[in-house]
């Protein structure tokens, strides 16, 4: 019997090992222990980052949100029905990124940046992180340029500036989306790029908005990010951040952008759902403790950045230009309750709010802007000069009219001054009415405000104020086109414009053609 030589055996094994061709690959892999309602628990994953992408079999991805002692809680991005217990889960070492760039303009994409409009794939290769840190104090610049919404009531009383966060708040079906969509339509020739983020909306509503933008010719400079009511809570939670990243692309390159979040109440509800499924402790109204941070870290990214920031970001490719991202978040209230948890949070984060009131809407005053409660904290410095000059008495007239109208219900005989004030208030209220999808130019708006401010409406019947305004604007655009063009270009108010407007209105009133 042949005797085995241990040294010989070890030499053979060593030789075999050396010849073995195995590419070494360090893998951080775990096992799925439970799958339910879009939440996956994974055991055995080490060194996972918060917010890291986790890959499951079949190219399904998740996002790590709960890092616990012996397991990781992740939310699945997309369809989770193919996942089952015992499957493997791998760390990717990447955080979630979405496509950015001008190629997205005119397209409808989902929360992950995948096109859903049937117009073919996106041609860009550039991506950016969904979660980003907002620019610091040093890189910011004060808001001093206007964003014209095209609404008299907003641009005159609650002006919005580039880089501002202005909240639109009100009950359901009161014209919040209409106001935001009109603001986007008004930007089609302003050079401001727009992003419309729909969160938890009906697909028919989103399709209607896209159709209106297309009809108005504003879709070409707008990106629509849609996370409809049928999408998972994870995608509804991520959509605003994805839209913000797409808007920041323009801001960081010295351009101006406007983003509408429609609406953040539904995003908070989606985040609450995710948090409760992840077994996080609930707080007030069952929202998690960090629901304020959910919105503050999103809205702080809307800002006006300095020339130095843009130059540093573009490595000197763009110089001498500031960039801005203006946010119009929308919040839906229940029966006008602005003291609920999410509304108070967002009011405290933003630079002002446009409050829409049900009673005014039902009374036919549309847009139903309550001038007494609405405020713009920084927009005054950005207001167009001519609008600022002519709108001074409008807010006061409306506030006094509200007060006197309530008082007049109880008083039988009113003195002459009070009666005149009430009549003026009625005419101004009538003048502030505006049709949907009909944003006004600066010159048209200035003309309306001039007529009210200088008392040219005093002898016009309240019921005919609207037709008077339309006829006056048509007359000026036809017979005084040069003056209107000058106002639209410069936005200044001087003696020449004052005299031109006064003479034109007097001439128009003499015709009695309204």
From Swiss-Prot:
TM segment ranges: none
The keyword Ribosomal protein is assigned to this record: no
Topological type in the membrane: Peripheral membrane protein
Site (Required for activity): 374
PROSITE patterns attached to this UniProt entry: ATPASE_ALPHA_BETA (PS00152)
GO MF term (any one): ADP binding
Reaction(s) catalysed (UniProt annotation): ATP + H2O + 4 H(+)(in) = ADP + phosphate + 5 H(+)(out)
Family annotation (InterPro entries): ATP_synth_asu-like_sf (IPR023366), ATP_synth_asu_C (IPR000793), ATP_synth_asu_C_sf (IPR038376), ATP_synth_F1_a_nt-bd_dom (IPR033732), ATP_synth_F1_asu (IPR005294), ATPase_a/bsu_AS (IPR020003), ATPase_F1/V1/A1_a/bsu_N (IPR004100), ATPase_F1/V1/A1_a/bsu_N_sf (IPR036121)
HAMAP family in UniProt: ATP_synth_alpha_bact (MF_01346)
Role of this protein: Produces ATP from ADP in the presence of a proton gradient across the membrane. The alpha chain is a regulatory subunit.
Protein name according to UniProt: ATP synthase subunit alpha
């Amino acid at each position: 019997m042949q005797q085995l030589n241990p040294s010989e055996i070890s030499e053979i094994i060593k030789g075999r090992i050396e010849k073995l061709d195995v590419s070494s690959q360090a893998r951080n892999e775990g096992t799925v222990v439970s799958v339910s309602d879009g939440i996956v628990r994974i055991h055995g994953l080490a060194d996972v980052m918060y917010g890291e992408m986790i890959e499951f079999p079949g190219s399904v991805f998740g996002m790590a949100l709960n890092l616990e002692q012996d397991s990781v809680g992740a939310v699945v991005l997309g369809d989770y029905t193919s996942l089952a217990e015992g499957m493997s889960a791998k760390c990717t070492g990447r955080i979630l990124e979405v496509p950015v760039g001008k190629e997205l303009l005119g397209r409808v994409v989902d929360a992950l940046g995948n096109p859903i409009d049937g117009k073919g794939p996106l041609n860009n290769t550039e991506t950016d992180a969904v979660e980003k840190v907002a620019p610091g104090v040093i890189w910011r610049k004060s808001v001093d340029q206007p964003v014209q919404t095209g609404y008299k009531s907003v641009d005159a009383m609650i002006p919005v500036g580039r880089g501002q966060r202005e909240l639109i708040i009100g009950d359901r079906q009161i014209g919040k989306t209409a106001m935001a969509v009109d603001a986007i339509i008004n930007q089609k020739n302003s050079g401001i790029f727009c992003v419309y983020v729909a969160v938890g909306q009906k697909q028919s509503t989103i399709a209607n908005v896209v159709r209106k933008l297309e009809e108005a010719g504003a879709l070409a400079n707008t990106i629509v990010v849609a996370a409809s009511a049928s999408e998972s809570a994870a995608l509804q939670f991520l959509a605003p951040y994805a839209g913000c990243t797409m808007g920041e692309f323009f801001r960081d390159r010295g351009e101006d952008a406007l983003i509408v979040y429609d609406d953040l109440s539904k995003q908070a509800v989606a985040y609450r759902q995710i948090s409760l499924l992840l077994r996080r402790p609930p707080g007030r109204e069952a929202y998690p403790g960090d629901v304020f941070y959910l919105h503050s870290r999103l809205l702080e990214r809307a800002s006006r950045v300095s020339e130095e920031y843009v130059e540093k970001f573009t490595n000197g490719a763009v110089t001498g230009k500031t960039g801005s991202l203006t946010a119009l978040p929308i919040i839906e209230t229940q029966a006008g309750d602005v003291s609920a948890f999410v509304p108070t949070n967002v009011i405290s984060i933003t630079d002002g709010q446009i409050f829409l009131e049900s009673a005014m809407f039902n009374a036919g005053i549309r847009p139903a802007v309550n001038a007494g409660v609405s405020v713009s904290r920084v927009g005054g410095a950005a207001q167009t000069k001519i609008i600022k000059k002519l709108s001074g008495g409008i807010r006061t007239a409306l506030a006094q009219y509200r007060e006197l109208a309530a008082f007049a219900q109880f008083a039988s005989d009113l003195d002459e001054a009070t009666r005149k004030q009430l009549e003026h208030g009625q005419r101004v209220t009538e003048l502030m009415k505006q049709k949907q999808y009909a944003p006004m130019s600066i010159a048209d708006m200035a003309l309306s405000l001039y007529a009210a401010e200088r008392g040219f409406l005093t002898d016009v019947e309240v019921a005919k104020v609207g037709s008077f305004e339309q006829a006056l604007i048509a007359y000026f655009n036809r017979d005084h086109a040069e003056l209107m063009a000058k106002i639209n270009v410069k936005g200044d108010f001087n003696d020449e414009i004052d005299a031109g407007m006064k003479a034109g209105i007097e001439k128009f009133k003499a015709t009695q053609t309204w």
